[in-house]
Protein backbone atom coordinates (compact mmCIF):
# COMPACT_ATOMS: atom_id res chain seq x y z
CA UNK A 1 0.00 0.00 0.00
CA UNK A 2 2.84 2.37 0.89
CA UNK A 3 4.67 1.57 -2.36
CA UNK A 4 1.54 2.50 -4.33
CA UNK A 5 1.28 5.87 -2.55
CA UNK A 6 4.97 6.51 -3.19
CA UNK A 7 4.56 5.70 -6.88
CA UNK A 8 1.54 8.05 -7.15
CA UNK A 9 3.48 10.85 -5.47
CA UNK A 10 6.47 10.39 -7.81
CA UNK A 11 4.16 10.32 -10.83
CA UNK A 12 2.45 13.54 -9.70
CA UNK A 13 5.79 15.30 -9.18
CA UNK A 14 7.07 14.23 -12.59
CA UNK A 15 3.89 15.47 -14.27
CA UNK A 16 4.17 18.80 -12.47
CA UNK A 17 7.85 19.16 -13.45
CA UNK A 18 7.10 18.47 -17.12
CA UNK A 19 4.27 21.02 -17.06
CA UNK A 20 6.50 23.69 -15.49
CA UNK A 21 9.25 22.99 -18.04
CA UNK A 22 6.81 23.39 -20.92
CA UNK A 23 5.51 26.68 -19.51
CA UNK A 24 9.05 28.05 -19.08
CA UNK A 25 9.89 27.07 -22.67
CA UNK A 26 6.77 28.75 -24.05
CA UNK A 27 7.32 31.95 -22.08
CA UNK A 28 11.01 32.11 -23.00
CA UNK A 29 10.32 31.46 -26.67
CA UNK A 30 7.63 34.15 -26.76
CA UNK A 31 9.88 36.73 -25.10
CA UNK A 32 12.68 36.04 -27.58
CA UNK A 33 10.47 36.20 -30.66
CA UNK A 34 8.99 39.50 -29.52
CA UNK A 35 12.30 41.01 -28.48
CA UNK A 36 12.28 43.97 -30.87
CA UNK A 37 8.96 45.58 -29.83
CA UNK A 38 9.42 44.76 -26.15
CA UNK A 39 12.78 46.58 -25.94
CA UNK A 40 11.22 49.89 -26.96
CA UNK A 41 7.91 49.32 -25.16
CA UNK A 42 9.53 48.56 -21.81
CA UNK A 43 11.93 51.49 -21.80
CA UNK A 44 10.14 54.35 -23.54
CA UNK A 45 6.64 55.63 -22.84
CA UNK A 46 6.48 57.20 -26.29
CA UNK A 47 8.53 55.95 -29.27
CA UNK A 48 8.92 59.46 -30.71
CA UNK A 49 10.96 61.97 -28.76
CA UNK A 50 10.18 65.69 -28.57
CA UNK A 51 12.94 66.30 -31.12
CA UNK A 52 11.13 64.09 -33.63
CA UNK A 53 13.65 61.29 -33.32
CA UNK A 54 12.25 57.76 -33.02
CA UNK A 55 13.85 55.98 -30.08
CA UNK A 56 14.82 52.87 -32.07
CA UNK A 57 17.75 54.94 -33.38
CA UNK A 58 19.27 54.79 -29.88
CA UNK A 59 20.05 51.09 -30.36
CA UNK A 60 20.32 50.83 -34.16
CA UNK A 61 23.13 53.30 -34.82
CA UNK A 62 23.57 53.01 -38.59
CA UNK A 63 21.34 55.21 -40.74
CA UNK A 64 19.42 53.41 -43.48
CA UNK A 65 16.44 54.37 -45.69
CA UNK A 66 12.79 53.59 -45.05
CA UNK A 67 9.72 54.50 -47.08
CA UNK A 68 6.00 54.75 -46.35
CA UNK A 69 3.10 54.94 -48.79
CA UNK A 70 -0.48 55.87 -47.85
CA UNK A 71 -3.44 57.28 -49.80
CA UNK A 72 -3.49 61.05 -50.21
CA UNK A 73 -6.96 61.20 -48.63
CA UNK A 74 -9.38 58.79 -46.97
CA UNK A 75 -13.03 58.92 -45.97
CA UNK A 76 -14.19 58.35 -42.37
CA UNK A 77 -14.57 54.78 -41.08
CA UNK A 78 -12.61 53.36 -44.01
CA UNK A 79 -9.92 50.66 -44.09
CA UNK A 80 -6.80 51.57 -46.09
CA UNK A 81 -3.23 50.29 -46.54
CA UNK A 82 -0.13 51.86 -45.05
CA UNK A 83 2.81 50.24 -46.85
CA UNK A 84 6.23 50.43 -45.15
CA UNK A 85 9.25 49.46 -47.25
CA UNK A 86 12.56 48.51 -45.60
CA UNK A 87 15.03 47.99 -48.46
CA UNK A 88 18.36 46.19 -48.11
CA UNK A 89 20.63 43.79 -49.98
CA UNK A 90 19.10 40.32 -49.54
CA UNK A 91 22.53 38.71 -49.98
CA UNK A 92 23.82 40.23 -46.73
CA UNK A 93 24.28 38.12 -43.58
CA UNK A 94 24.30 39.51 -40.05
CA UNK A 95 26.09 38.40 -36.90
CA UNK A 96 23.69 36.51 -34.64
CA UNK A 97 23.80 36.53 -30.83
CA UNK A 98 25.85 33.31 -30.83
CA UNK A 99 28.44 34.79 -33.20
CA UNK A 100 27.33 32.85 -36.26
CA UNK A 101 26.07 34.43 -39.50
CA UNK A 102 22.39 34.44 -40.42
CA UNK A 103 19.71 36.23 -42.40
CA UNK A 104 18.59 39.71 -41.41
CA UNK A 105 15.29 40.36 -39.69
CA UNK A 106 13.23 43.54 -39.95
CA UNK A 107 10.89 45.50 -37.72
CA UNK A 108 8.81 48.65 -37.92
CA UNK A 109 6.88 51.14 -35.83
CA UNK A 110 4.18 53.39 -37.27
CA UNK A 111 2.80 56.40 -35.38
CA UNK A 112 -0.67 57.28 -36.65
CA UNK A 113 -2.75 60.37 -35.83
CA UNK A 114 -5.02 60.11 -32.80
CA UNK A 115 -8.16 58.18 -33.71
CA UNK A 116 -6.54 56.11 -36.47
CA UNK A 117 -5.92 52.50 -35.42
CA UNK A 118 -5.35 48.93 -36.55
CA UNK A 119 -8.33 47.67 -38.56
CA UNK A 120 -10.30 44.82 -36.93
CA UNK A 121 -10.02 41.47 -38.75
CA UNK A 122 -13.65 41.49 -39.90
CA UNK A 123 -13.12 44.82 -41.69
CA UNK A 124 -10.01 43.76 -43.63
CA UNK A 125 -10.62 42.77 -47.25
CA UNK A 126 -9.23 39.48 -48.65
CA UNK A 127 -6.88 41.48 -50.92
CA UNK A 128 -5.29 43.29 -47.96
CA UNK A 129 -5.09 40.07 -45.93
CA UNK A 130 -3.18 38.43 -48.77
CA UNK A 131 -0.68 41.32 -48.83
CA UNK A 132 -0.29 41.20 -45.03
CA UNK A 133 0.76 37.56 -44.98
CA UNK A 134 1.06 36.02 -41.51
CA UNK A 135 2.09 39.21 -39.74
CA UNK A 136 0.78 39.96 -36.25
CA UNK A 137 0.77 43.62 -35.20
CA UNK A 138 0.84 44.93 -31.63
CA UNK A 139 -0.23 48.17 -29.97
CA UNK A 140 2.71 50.05 -28.48
CA UNK A 141 0.63 50.54 -25.34
CA UNK A 142 -2.93 49.42 -24.55
CA UNK A 143 -3.89 53.10 -24.33
CA UNK A 144 -1.94 54.05 -27.49
CA UNK A 145 -3.89 52.24 -30.17
CA UNK A 146 -2.62 54.64 -32.82
CA UNK A 147 0.99 53.39 -32.43
CA UNK A 148 1.68 49.98 -33.96
CA UNK A 149 4.81 47.80 -33.84
CA UNK A 150 5.89 44.68 -35.70
CA UNK A 151 9.01 42.54 -35.59
CA UNK A 152 11.38 40.95 -35.68
CA UNK A 153 10.19 39.13 -38.81
CA UNK A 154 12.20 37.56 -41.67
CA UNK A 155 13.51 40.35 -43.89
CA UNK A 156 13.59 38.29 -47.07
CA UNK A 157 9.83 37.77 -46.81
CA UNK A 158 8.69 41.01 -45.19
CA UNK A 159 10.91 43.84 -46.45
CA UNK A 160 7.55 45.37 -47.44
CA UNK A 161 5.04 45.46 -44.57
CA UNK A 162 1.36 46.27 -45.12
CA UNK A 163 -0.48 47.78 -42.13
CA UNK A 164 -4.31 47.66 -42.37
CA UNK A 165 -5.51 50.97 -40.89
CA UNK A 166 -9.02 52.08 -39.95
CA UNK A 167 -9.74 55.80 -40.25
CA UNK A 168 -11.83 57.47 -37.51
CA UNK A 169 -15.29 58.96 -37.91
CA UNK A 170 -15.67 62.51 -36.53
CA UNK A 171 -19.39 61.85 -36.16
CA UNK A 172 -18.65 59.39 -33.34
CA UNK A 173 -15.28 60.76 -32.14
CA UNK A 174 -15.65 64.42 -31.28
CA UNK A 175 -11.91 64.99 -30.83
CA UNK A 176 -11.27 64.02 -34.49
CA UNK A 177 -11.68 66.57 -37.28
CA UNK A 178 -11.52 66.67 -41.06
CA UNK A 179 -7.91 67.81 -41.41
CA UNK A 180 -4.51 66.90 -42.82
CA UNK A 181 -2.56 64.70 -40.40
CA UNK A 182 1.10 63.57 -40.20
CA UNK A 183 2.12 59.91 -40.06
CA UNK A 184 5.57 58.90 -38.74
CA UNK A 185 7.34 55.61 -39.40
CA UNK A 186 10.55 53.89 -38.35
CA UNK A 187 12.02 50.73 -39.81
CA UNK A 188 15.11 48.67 -39.03
CA UNK A 189 16.89 45.81 -40.68
CA UNK A 190 19.26 43.65 -38.66
CA UNK A 191 20.18 43.62 -34.97
CA UNK A 192 21.04 46.66 -32.91
CA UNK A 193 24.44 47.71 -31.63
CA UNK A 194 23.38 48.72 -28.12
CA UNK A 195 20.91 47.11 -25.72
CA UNK A 196 18.42 49.34 -23.85
CA UNK A 197 20.49 48.95 -20.66
CA UNK A 198 23.44 50.60 -22.44
CA UNK A 199 25.55 47.47 -22.96
CA UNK A 200 27.00 46.69 -26.37
CA UNK A 201 25.77 43.79 -28.45
CA UNK A 202 28.17 41.63 -30.46
CA UNK A 203 26.98 43.42 -33.61
CA UNK A 204 29.26 46.43 -33.27
CA UNK A 205 32.91 47.48 -33.15
CA UNK A 206 34.90 47.10 -29.91
CA UNK A 207 37.56 49.68 -29.01
CA UNK A 208 40.54 49.54 -26.69
CA UNK A 209 39.78 50.79 -23.18
CA UNK A 210 43.44 51.58 -22.60
CA UNK A 211 46.58 52.46 -24.52
CA UNK A 212 49.56 50.11 -24.39
CA UNK A 213 50.91 46.84 -25.76
CA UNK A 214 48.74 43.82 -26.55
CA UNK A 215 50.48 41.23 -24.38
CA UNK A 216 48.04 38.36 -24.79
CA UNK A 217 45.03 37.31 -26.88
CA UNK A 218 43.15 34.32 -25.47
CA UNK A 219 40.32 32.65 -27.33
CA UNK A 220 37.37 31.90 -25.02
CA UNK A 221 35.83 28.44 -24.89
CA UNK A 222 32.39 29.61 -26.11
CA UNK A 223 33.79 32.03 -28.66
CA UNK A 224 35.19 35.52 -28.46
CA UNK A 225 38.47 36.76 -27.03
CA UNK A 226 40.14 38.16 -23.93
CA UNK A 227 42.67 40.81 -24.93
CA UNK A 228 45.21 41.80 -22.30
CA UNK A 229 46.69 45.29 -22.75
CA UNK A 230 49.72 46.34 -20.69
CA UNK A 231 50.20 50.05 -20.07
CA UNK A 232 53.93 50.40 -19.33
CA UNK A 233 53.71 54.08 -18.38
CA UNK A 234 51.24 53.42 -15.57
CA UNK A 235 52.34 49.88 -14.81
CA UNK A 236 48.90 48.32 -15.08
CA UNK A 237 47.14 45.90 -17.37
CA UNK A 238 43.57 45.90 -18.71
CA UNK A 239 41.59 42.96 -20.07
CA UNK A 240 39.08 43.75 -22.82
CA UNK A 241 36.40 41.13 -23.45
CA UNK A 242 35.34 40.62 -27.08
CA UNK A 243 32.17 38.56 -27.65
CA UNK A 244 31.88 36.06 -30.52
CA UNK A 245 31.11 37.70 -33.85
CA UNK A 246 33.42 40.66 -34.59
CA UNK A 247 36.76 39.89 -36.28
CA UNK A 248 40.00 40.89 -34.55
CA UNK A 249 42.12 43.65 -36.09
CA UNK A 250 45.04 43.50 -33.62
CA UNK A 251 47.69 40.91 -32.77
CA UNK A 252 49.95 40.13 -29.82
CA UNK A 253 52.85 42.53 -29.39
CA UNK A 254 51.09 45.35 -31.23
CA UNK A 255 51.13 48.86 -29.78
CA UNK A 256 47.65 50.40 -29.64
CA UNK A 257 46.08 53.71 -28.66
CA UNK A 258 43.11 54.48 -26.44
CA UNK A 259 39.79 53.88 -28.26
CA UNK A 260 41.58 52.23 -31.19
CA UNK A 261 39.30 49.63 -32.85
CA UNK A 262 40.18 46.13 -31.71
CA UNK A 263 37.66 44.54 -34.07
CA UNK A 264 35.93 45.16 -37.35
CA UNK A 265 32.36 46.47 -37.39
CA UNK A 266 30.16 43.49 -38.35
CA UNK A 267 26.96 45.51 -38.59
CA UNK A 268 25.29 45.38 -42.01
CA UNK A 269 21.87 46.70 -40.95
CA UNK A 270 20.52 49.98 -39.70
CA UNK A 271 17.49 52.09 -38.86
CA UNK A 272 15.63 54.75 -40.79
CA UNK A 273 12.65 56.98 -40.17
CA UNK A 274 10.33 59.02 -42.35
CA UNK A 275 6.97 60.72 -42.44
CA UNK A 276 4.06 61.47 -44.73
CA UNK A 277 0.65 63.15 -44.60
CA UNK A 278 -2.92 61.98 -45.03
CA UNK A 279 -6.17 63.94 -45.31
CA UNK A 280 -9.31 62.82 -43.49
CA UNK A 281 -11.81 63.93 -46.09
CA UNK A 282 -15.36 65.10 -45.35
CA UNK A 283 -17.84 63.21 -47.60
CA UNK A 284 -19.99 66.35 -47.83
CA UNK A 285 -17.04 68.25 -49.28
CA UNK A 286 -16.57 65.54 -51.88
CA UNK A 287 -20.26 65.64 -52.75
CA UNK A 288 -20.13 69.43 -52.96
CA UNK A 289 -17.10 69.28 -55.25
CA UNK A 290 -18.83 66.75 -57.51
CA UNK A 291 -21.94 68.92 -57.61
CA UNK A 292 -19.83 71.97 -58.49
CA UNK A 293 -18.00 70.13 -61.26
CA UNK A 294 -21.30 68.80 -62.63
CA UNK A 295 -22.80 72.30 -62.65
CA UNK A 296 -19.74 73.68 -64.46
CA UNK A 297 -19.97 70.95 -67.11
CA UNK A 298 -23.70 71.56 -67.58
CA UNK A 299 -23.09 75.31 -67.85
CA UNK A 300 -20.49 74.67 -70.56
CA UNK A 301 -22.89 72.40 -72.45
CA UNK A 302 -25.71 74.96 -72.30
CA UNK A 303 -23.29 77.68 -73.40
CA UNK A 304 -22.25 75.65 -76.45
CA UNK A 305 -25.87 74.87 -77.31
CA UNK A 306 -26.84 78.53 -76.92
CA UNK A 307 -23.95 79.57 -79.14
CA UNK A 308 -24.97 77.12 -81.85
CA UNK A 309 -28.57 78.34 -81.62
CA UNK A 310 -27.40 81.95 -81.95
CA UNK A 311 -25.27 81.06 -84.98
CA UNK A 312 -28.27 79.39 -86.63
CA UNK A 313 -30.41 82.51 -86.07
CA UNK A 314 -27.70 84.73 -87.53
CA UNK A 315 -27.35 82.46 -90.56
CA UNK A 316 -31.12 82.45 -91.06
CA UNK A 317 -31.30 86.27 -90.92
CA UNK A 318 -28.45 86.61 -93.43
CA UNK A 319 -30.16 84.24 -95.87
CA UNK A 320 -33.46 86.06 -95.44
UniProtKB/Swiss-Prot annotation:
Residues where heme binds: 36, 56, 59-60
Localization: Plastid, Chloroplast thylakoid membrane
Bilayer disposition of the protein: Single-pass membrane protein
GO cellular component, one term: chloroplast thylakoid membrane
Keywords: Chloroplast, Electron transport, Heme, Iron, Membrane, Metal-binding, Photosynthesis, Plastid, Signal, Thylakoid, Transmembrane, Transmembrane helix, Transport
GO MF terms, alphabetically ordered: electron transfer activity; heme binding; iron ion binding
Secretion signal, residue range per the UniProt entry: 1-35
Biological process annotations from GO: photosynthesis
Transmembrane segments: 286-306
Cofactors named for this entry: heme
Alphabetized InterPro entries for the sequence: Cyt-f_TM, Cyt_f, Cyt_f_lg_dom, Cyt_f_lg_dom_sf, Rudment_hybrid_motif
Cited SUPFAM superfamilies: Cytochrome f subunit of the cytochrome b6f complex, transmembrane anchor (SSF103431), Cytochrome f, large domain (SSF49441), Rudiment single hybrid motif (SSF51246)
Cofactor remark: Binds 1 heme group covalently.
Family membership noted in the UniProt record: Belongs to the cytochrome f family.
Function noted in UniProt: Component of the cytochrome b6-f complex, which mediates electron transfer between photosystem II (PSII) and photosystem I (PSI), cyclic electron flow around PSI, and state transitions.
Subunit structure: The 4 large subunits of the cytochrome b6-f complex are cytochrome b6, subunit IV (17 kDa polypeptide, petD), cytochrome f and the Rieske protein, while the 4 small subunits are PetG, PetL, PetM and PetN. The complex functions as a dimer.
This protein's name: Cytochrome f
Gene name as annotated: petA
Amino acid sequence: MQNRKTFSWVKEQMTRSIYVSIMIYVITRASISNAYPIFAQQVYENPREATGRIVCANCHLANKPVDIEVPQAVLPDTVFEAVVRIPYDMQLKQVLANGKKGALNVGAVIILPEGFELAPPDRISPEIKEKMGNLSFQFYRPNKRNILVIGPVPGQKYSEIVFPILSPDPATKKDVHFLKYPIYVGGNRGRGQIYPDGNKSNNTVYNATSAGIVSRIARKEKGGYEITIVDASEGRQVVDIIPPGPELLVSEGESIKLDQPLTSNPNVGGFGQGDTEIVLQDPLRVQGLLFFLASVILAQIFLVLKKKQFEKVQLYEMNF
